[in-house]
Design a protein with these regions (language model features):
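Glycine-rich NAD(P)-binding loop of the Rossmann-fold in SDR/ketoreductase-type enzymes
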Residues: 50, 66, 86-97, 135, ...
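Rossmann-fold cofactor-recognition segment
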Residues: 40-51
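NAD(P)H-binding glycine-rich loop region in Rossmannoid oxidoreductase-like domains
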Residues: 49-90, 101-104
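Active-site Tyr-X1-5-Lys
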Residues: 120, 132-156
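NAD(P)-dependent short-chain dehydrogenase/reductase
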Residues: 154-200, 207
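N-terminal Rossmann NAD(P)H-binding glycine-rich loop of SDR-like oxidoreductase domains
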Residues: 3-23
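Mid/C-terminal beta-alpha module of Rossmann-like enzyme folds, strongest
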Residues: 204-266
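Conserved Rossmann-fold NAD(P)-dependent oxidoreductase catalytic core, especially the SDR/UDP-sugar
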Residues: 96-136
Length: 284
């Protein structure tokens, strides 16, 4: 197959490109910058997804079979503008351009969303759980999910748990570090979190290429929970986490409700909410 991947030069995208090429597929990679990695079956196109004409030209010229839409504004490193308008432009408006091109050319699309689109929800979560996003990232991804359903005839949505590699843990470290690499923390007896190792994320997308596109939503996560106690012990063994602050759960819960009384449902309260009531998801 010839598969179009947006965000092909990003952390996740670069892994997916290599794995799909190893499976014998041809990849059309769209990104604002070209990857340093080259292959005869890797067609790189440097463009901005806001450029509708350039985007549609790629679809016209390359005759792709499927699309994986990975490109997004997610993590904050190096970003100066974190307004909702910026998130909406990148994650909704640019996504709409991709979805419209897919619909025009009858290309099935896999949209990579996030569990942050679910938001502040307690209890067991399924793909059918009503969304209550709080963060700008989660709100924009939830909006994009809605637009995908309206625009495209054939689609799937994969809501990824936080993705990590051995060397890049991104926002996972927030769950056990106050200040990396020396000051760790744990709440109560230590929480367990749903996360997603890069290999599992890549496998889910590679497998999708050979599956029937059935307009369904799936939550993608590791089979095992991330145990904060085990993780801190591992960090200490490697010379990090020299100090571990233990926070009684009751104290953090009280703090959460005090913060919420002042700020309501906001990014500040959402971060504490996720630490106290980690997601527990099932396929439904």
């Amino acid at each position: 197959m010839k598969i179009l991947i947006t965000g092909s030069a990003g952390m996740i995208g670069s892994y997916v490109v290599k794995e799909l090429i190893a499976k014998g597929h041809t990849i059309v990679g769209l990104d604002r910058r070209e990857s340093d990695w080259k292959h005869e079956n890797f067609i790189q196109v440097a463009l901005d997804l806001a450029d509708k004409k350039a985007l549609n030209d790629v679809f016209e010229n390359e005759n792709v079979d499927r699309c994986i839409h990975l490109a997004a504004l997610a993590h904050f490193a190096g970003e100066n503008d974190l307004s909702f308008e910026r998130f909406k432009f990148v994650n909704v408006t640019c996504a709409e351009n991709v979805f419209e091109a897919c619909a025009l050319h009858s290309v099935p699309v896999l949209f990579i969303s996030t569990v942050d689109a679910i938001g502040m929800v307690k209890g067991v979560i399924t793909p059918e759980t009503e969304l209550n996003p709080i963060s700008n990232y989660g709100k924009s991804k939830a909006m994009a999910e809605g637009r995908l359903k309206e625009i495209c005839q054939k689609w799937n949505i994969y809501r990824f748990s936080p993705v990590y590699t051995k060397t890049q843990k991104r926002d996972i470290e927030k769950r056990y570090y106050l200040k990396y690499p020396n000051w760790a923390y744990k709440i109560g007896s230590g929480e367990k979190f749903e996360v997603l190792e890069i290999g599992g994320a890549v496998k889910s997308m590679v497998d999708w290429v050979d599956k029937e596109v059935d307009n369904s939503i799936h939550i993608i996560k590791d089979a095992e929970l991330l145990d904060v106690n085990t993780l801190i012990q591992r960090e200490k063994a490697e010379g990090r986490a020299k100090h571990v602050l233990w926070l009684p759960r009751w104290m953090v819960v009280c703090g959460y409700y005090c913060i919420r009384a002042v700020f309501g449902k906001s990014n500040k309260t959402y971060l504490v909410f996720k630490a106290l009531w980690p997601f527990r998801t099932i396929e439904g």
